[in-house]
């Protein structure tokens, strides 16, 4: 018997088994449809760097999701990633500064294009980190906050709320953040 557990020996095989069997997909636990569904939308991590200690909150969500599955409830933990506009711009501008350039040197269109490419390059590693941690989200349903279908739903919802008078303009103090 080995003196210490070496996760790299076992966990890739276990993870592959989970993925091959779609173990975390909605309906994978043969749920009792008479029980109330459990749906949890993952607060999307920002696609501008690695996960950090703050992302440990996902452990709590994972526990709740696994518990709902064990109860036989129809269960979905919806994963996603976010572009985090302002923060991503800050991170990307620091990267540019380290390379001796700035967004002003690039021009607006080139800067926008390069930030978009940067975000695209960061989404994969973040999702991979979450999978390595064993989070039981339905990875086939991964969403990005700027996916066309997500943007369409947000715009439709905004227009509906505006038309119903739930969104309005006025001179009011707002809690922004």
Regions found by a protein language model. Give the residues of each.
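N-terminal, positively charged nucleic-acid-binding surface of large information/translation enzymes
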Residues: 1-177
């Amino acid at each position: 018997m080995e003196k210490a557990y070496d996760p790299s020996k076992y966990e890739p095989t276990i993870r592959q088994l989970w993925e091959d069997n779609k173990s975390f997909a909605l309906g994978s636990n043969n749920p009792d449809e008479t029980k109330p569904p459990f749906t949890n939308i993952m607060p999307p991590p920002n696609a501008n760097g690695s996960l950090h200690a703050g992302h440990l909150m996902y452990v709590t969500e994972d526990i709740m999701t696994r518990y709902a599955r064990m109860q036989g409830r129809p269960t979905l933990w919806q994963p996603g990633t976010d572009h985090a506009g302002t923060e991503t711009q800050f991170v990307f501008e620091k990267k540019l500064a380290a390379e001796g350039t700035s967004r002003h040197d690039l021009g607006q269109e080139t800067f926008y294009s390069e930030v978009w490419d940067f975000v695209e390059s960061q989404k994969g590693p973040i999702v991979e980190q979450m999978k390595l941690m064993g989070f039981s989200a339905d990875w086939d349903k991964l969403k990005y906050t700027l996916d066309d279908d997500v943007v369409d739903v947000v715009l439709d919802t905004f227009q509906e709320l505006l038309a119903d008078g739930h969104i309005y303009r006025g001179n009011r103090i707002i809690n922004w953040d």
